[in-house]
Amino acid sequence: MGLLGELLLLPAAPLRGTAWVLRQVVAEAERQYYDPAAVQRELARLNELLEAGEIDEEEFDRREDELLDRLEKGPRQS
């Protein structure tokens, strides 16, 4: 790109930096959201709620399906 190109793009550096940070935050959030260990913990907690009578079978099934979908889909590949 050369020196002239770098100088012309210099005013956009904060915007490019912000975009990079946002991409990193989204990537980490997705990594945590789709982490199999985290999903397993949530499934265990969901089972505890069902056994304690805090949620009914219908709610359990709905939330369990959502968690299993997360395990199946995994993070987006960019």
Curated annotation (Swiss-Prot):
Its main location: other. Signal peptide: none annotated. Induction: Gas vesicle production is induced by growth conditions that promote production of secondary metabolites tiancimycin A and B. Might be a minor component of the gas vesicle involved in nucleating their formation. Gas vesicles are hollow, gas filled proteinaceous nanostructures found in some microorganisms. It is not clear what function gas vesicles perform in soil bacteria. It is found in: Gas vesicle. InterPro entries: GvpG. Keywords: Gas vesicle. Belongs to the gas vesicle GvpG family. GO terms for cellular component: gas vesicle. This strain probably produces some gas vesicles from the probable gvpO-gvpA-gvpF-gvpG-gvpJ-gvpL-gvpS-gvpK operon; it can be induced to produce more under certain growth conditions. It holds the Pfam family GvpG. This is Gas vesicle protein G.
